[in-house]
């Protein structure tokens, strides 16, 4: 590609930011154009590549998108909802595309993303793993065949530092199953159980959450009947799988116009 896509990595010194820098550096057709950290961070002004063991990139870490606005075409953001929404406002004002992996948005935040998609290109996904997005399709098929007569439970586990629960991926899995069955997840979801709960309602979708150690991300959806059960699982062992997927999404987005897309669009799974 003669003109590679220049990427601004938000939270470049965080867990995902570091692997995003690695993924971009190792990929064709994209380059690190800017690297951002929060104001006051001790890493401001350092070379993003040298800081993360990637060699000198010539990209100094900044604390403001506005300061480096001419250095990038695309923002990749795996931060927090309030930070992402502020970055979204900047992207709208300056016509920058975005790949968003932030989870935990409320309804107003999701509405803001949808509205922004009318003006700029956005890929927004709860999970950028190719494997997880294949699981979404498998869940749709399983729900069609077994969903009406089985008990459906979703179990997810992540590292001790994850701040939202259930994970965005687990909720997306629940949405896929609920939509396939003609249900509203807001009405049928059960988040954890305690005490005398009574018998299980067949129409509910249960969620259980584990937060422990350094788990990168594990998800299992169970369709349980009397005498048998089907479990569809995905286990991630490295954040690089998410970073590579986000870079893939960014390269795909470079060929698209305005719109709010997800990884199902990127992978042609719709």
From Swiss-Prot:
Q: Which GO terms describe its biological process?
A: diaminopimelate biosynthetic process; lysine biosynthetic process via diaminopimelate
**Which regions form coiled coils?**
none
Sequence positions that bind NADP(+): 38
Pathway involvement of the protein, from the record: Amino-acid biosynthesis; L-lysine biosynthesis via DAP pathway; (S)-tetrahydrodipicolinate from L-aspartate: step 4/4
Which GO cellular component terms, listed alphabetically, does the Swiss-Prot or TrEMBL entry include?
cytosol
Q: Which InterPro entries has this protein been placed in? A: DapB_C, DapB_N, DapB_N_CS, DHDPR_bac, NAD(P)-bd_dom_sf
Q: Name one GO molecular function term.
A: NAD binding
Family annotation (Pfam families): DapB_C, DapB_N
Residues binding NAD(+) = 11-16, 37, 101-103, 125-128
Sorted UniProt keywords:
Amino-acid biosynthesis, Cytoplasm, Diaminopimelate biosynthesis, Lysine biosynthesis, NAD, NADP, Oxidoreductase
Catalysed reaction per UniProt?
(S)-2,3,4,5-tetrahydrodipicolinate + NAD(+) + H2O = (2S,4S)-4-hydroxy-2,3,4,5-tetrahydrodipicolinate + NADH + H(+); (S)-2,3,4,5-tetrahydrodipicolinate + NADP(+) + H2O = (2S,4S)-4-hydroxy-2,3,4,5-tetrahydrodipicolinate + NADPH + H(+)
Which cell locations does it reside in? Cytoplasm
Give me the disulphide-bonded residues: none
Q: What EC number is given for this enzyme?
A: 1.17.1.8
- List positions binding (S)-2,3,4,5-tetrahydrodipicolinate: 159, 168-169
What broad class describes the main subcellular location of this protein?
Answer: cytoplasm
Q: PROSITE patterns this protein is in?
A: DAPB
Functionally, this protein is described as follows:
Catalyzes the conversion of 4-hydroxy-tetrahydrodipicolinate (HTPA) to tetrahydrodipicolinate.
User: What PANTHER family has UniProt attached to this entry?
Assistant: 4-HYDROXY-TETRAHYDRODIPICOLINATE REDUCTASE 1, CHLOROPLASTIC-RELATED (PTHR20836:SF0), DIHYDRODIPICOLINATE REDUCTASE (PTHR20836)
Family (UniProt): Belongs to the DapB family.
| Protein name (record) | 4-hydroxy-tetrahydrodipicolinate reductase
Supply the source organism for this entry.
Aeromonas salmonicida (strain A449)
